[in-house]
Regions:
Chain B
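Generic secondary-structure signature for well-ordered alpha-helical cores
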Residues: 86, 129-133, 155-163, 197-209, ...
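Short Asp/Glu-rich motifs
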Residues: 99-100, 176, 349-350, 422, ...
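Active-site capping/gating regions of soluble enzymes
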Residues: 216, 232-241, 260-442
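A short glycine/serine-rich beta->alpha loop
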Residues: 136-142, 225-226, 268, 310-316, ...
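Conserved active-site and cofactor/substrate-binding residues in soluble primary-metabolism enzymes
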Residues: 40, 71-75, 83, 118-122, ...
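Flexible, glycine-rich loop/tail regions that form catalytic "lids" or insertion modules at the edges
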Residues: 6-33, 43-45, 94, 353, ...
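Catalytic alpha/beta active-site cores
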Residues: 1-266, 271, 290-293, 297-304, ...
Length: 140, 537
């Protein structure tokens, strides 16, 4: 990644982000690529590993004091699982932690996820730099 | 990491293949060493395992399919068989793959999503209704619960009066790559290896025409590995299974005949052809030289191929039809025994009947219109293809040596070394796409801002499918003989604690008693625990 200044190269410096795999989907390479890219952009990344319950993910997010949770879902269960994670965060009084989603998300489902409060939806075709920049803007 | 300056400027052709192999502009006759090649059907099988190629027998056209309930999937299977498909390939949902019953809270959101829900024998009876199991071959993409699904297939054949010895088909049953990519592991590595050896040793006697394992590179490939790495990891895993089977007292001349393999084919035509030819030659050499295998059939490298996967993109999705056609040609020139062509919309939804039919027709056009299947290994002897095959083979061997030097593939997986390496490779691949160095037409090059990316028809899962699965599940729990279930599960648990036992007969008994996948997995977890995933990046 070429950049002119340190800040431009690491726009996520100081941010803490959980990258999580809720549900049973085992396709984790997208989550890992995002985790590496966010780390390279300066963020502290906590990757949960596979098959985590929404409650577990919310608990990790709160315990680690993160700014954002990124959920990676490729199994088609994103509507159910995202709703459950958002609910679990609220149950822990952590509704202010921002939720982002990546994976195989049909265009028709974007509005439904946004109405749950999701702040950004990313698919595999989006350039990583764009993902990082958008995230940096969202997290201020 | 900037996007290509103008998406319509033609990129330069590179001198290196995606597997990192140098590709000269011109290759002369001096590049070919005929003694390394051999004849079709003869050691070292560079040119294929059969002397008559596809003239004797065409590859099996086998489309991966399954979703929602057993009833809906049964209907789709009959549709595909009516279209001239010659084998079934069963897609199972994640609860079935990971060993959870539909009623489990982890399972609920995933019921019937990426495949059919198959929680117990009564569902298998519905899934195969009206399909002659003695006449078609059935392939199951199943790993963590492969032994259980295989047991269920035997149980349903028993019920239908089909002799077990007549069954043909494949269970993927390759747990090692699940730890690296795809992720449907359940138990720790060692007991998982035992379960695999149990299925292979049992199958060699009970279902001698069945492939009890399909050692798969496909998933690491789709996750980021190059063609050379895909083949290297797969062969390394294959050798780990061979060593384990020998340790268990298996006769390599016998079990090696039923080992099969499985790969993705992506878009770089000659990397793919060379990968398949080099892998076939290397495996035969390993069998003969390292293990002194004498029977040529036990040196055969038989494999299926998927065309598509992560090489398919959402941008201008109809372009994917052409990608799949090119990839299918590479699979045929590489000598595949069975081919699954992805539908053009498969990268982002369950295919519709429309897209699924085009995928089948693609194979039929290549088989019966193009003429490329007439002559065995039509690229054999090409200066470039033989040179690229040699270089590919050297590259594969180099990667296998690195794994050996680390301490073997099992250690590399348990430590998370291979997983971390793959993640790094995936990041590199993604960066090359982002910068435009790797060309994806319609996505990072040759795209228009106003281009159409709609897929046309959208597949919708029946939203009530999960409820129907749950109702059926409750009904079987209420009506089955609970004492028989408990007795058989207890016997299974006892056998699992004793390494000398083969678990297959116990699992088949459990299936006949309508024990569920979740119950059998829970019983085995009590004995073996669960895999602890290394999550370091």
């Amino acid at each position: 990644m070429k950049a002119t200044t340190q800040d431009a190269a690491t726009p996520l410096r100081g941010k803490r982000i959980v990258v999580a795999k809720p549900g049973l989907d085992g396709h984790d390479i997208g989550a890992k690529v995002i985790a590496l890219a966010l780390r390279d952009a300066g963020a502290e990344v906590i990757y949960t590993g596979l098959r985590k319950t929404p409650e577990h993910i919310a608990r990790v997010a709160v315990d680690e004091g993160v700014d954002a949770v990124g959920l990676s879902i490729l199994s088609g269960s994103h509507r159910e699982l995202v709703a459950q994670v958002v609910q679990a965060l609220k149950a822990l009084d952590a509704g202010d932690i921002k939720v982002f989603v990546g994976g195989t998300i049909p265009a028709d489902d974007v509005a439904a996820l946004e109405s749950l409060g999701v702040r950004g939806i990313y698919t595999s075709e989006q350039p990583l730099q764009e993902v990082v920049e958008k995230l940096a803007r969202e997290l201020g | 990491m900037n996007a290509p300056e103008s998406p319509l400027v033609a990129p330069q052709l590179t001198q290196t293949s995606p597997s990192g192999i140098d590709v000269p502009v011109r290759v002369g006759a001096d590049a070919v060493d005929p003694s390394r090649i051999g004849a079709p059907g003869e050691f070292p099988f560079t040119r294929g395992i059969f002397p008559d190629g596809y003239r004797g027998r065409l590859w099996t056209i086998r489309q991966y399919s399954g979703f929602g309930t057993a009833e809906e999937s049964n209907e789709r299977y009959r549709f595909l068989l009516d279209q001239g498909q010659t084998g079934l390939s069963v897609a199972l949902d994640l609860p079935t793959q990971c060993g959870y019953d539909p009623i489990d809270p982890m399972a609920r959101p995933e019921i019937g999503k990426v495949g059919v829900s198959l929680s117990n024998l009564s569902e298998a009876e519905i899934l195969f209704k009206g399909i002659d199991l003695a006449a078609i071959s059935t392939s199951f993409t199943i790993n963590g619960t492969a032994a259980i699904v295989y047991a269920m297939y035997l149980a349903v054949a028993d019920k239908l009066g089909v002799p077990r010895a007549k069954l043909t088909g494949t269970i993927q049953n390759d747990i090692l790559k699940e730890y690296v990519a795809r992720g449907t592991w359940i138990f720790p590595v060692r007991p998982s290896m035992r379960l695999i050896a149990d299925t292979i040793l049992f199958s060699n006697d009970a279902t001698p025409r069945f492939n009890p394992i399909s050692i798969a590179g496909a998933h690491v490939r789709d996750a980021g590995a190059t063609a050379a790495e895909e083949m290297a990891y797969t062969l390394a895993n294959g050798l780990a299974y061979v060593d384990d089977l020998k340790r268990r007292g298996g006769d390599i001349e016998k079990f090696a005949k039923r080992l099969s393999f499985f790969f993705y084919v992506h878009m770089d035509f000659f990397d793919e052809v060379a990968k398949l030819r080099a892998g076939r030659r290397l495996w035969a050499r390993l069998m003969k030289e390292r293990y002194a295998v004498a029977d040529p059939k036990a040196q055969h490298f038989r494999f299926g191929v998927v065309c598509g996967g992560s090489s398919l993109v959402a941008a201008q999705p109809y372009n994917n039809i052409v990608r799949v056609a090119v990839e299918t040609m590479a699979a045929v020139m590489g000598g595949a025994q069975s081919i699954f062509t992805c539908a053009f919309d498969e990268a982002f939804q369950i295919p519709t009947e429309f897209s699924a039919e085009i995928a089948v027709r693609t194979q039929q056009m290549i088989a019966y219109e193009s003429g490329i299947a007439r002559t065995v290994d039509p690229l054999g002897g090409s200066y470039f293809v033989e040179q690229h095959t040699d270089r590919m083979e050297a590259s594969i061997e180099g990667i296998m040596r690195e794994i050996d030097e680390y301490g073997g593939v099992v250690k590399a997986i348990e430590d998370g070394w291979l997983q971390a390496r793959l993640a790094e490779r995936a990041l590199e691949r993604k960066m090359r796409i982002d910068t435009g160095e790797t060309v994806i037409v319609g996505q990072n090059h040759f795209r228009r801002e106003d281009q159409k990316n709609e897929v046309g028809e959208v597949f919708r899962l029946d939203p009530n499918a999960a409820n129907r699965v749950l109702e059926k599940y409750q009904r079987i729990r209420d009506t089955r003989d609970a004492a028989a279930v408990a007795k058989n599960l207890a016997r299974l648990g006892k056998a699992a604690a004793d390494e000398r036992e083969n678990l297959m007969p116990y699992l088949i008994d459990c299936c006949h008693a309508y024990a569920t996948v979740g119950e059998m997995v829970a019983t085995l977890k009590e004995q073996w625990g669960e895999f602890q995933e290394p999550v370091g990046l």
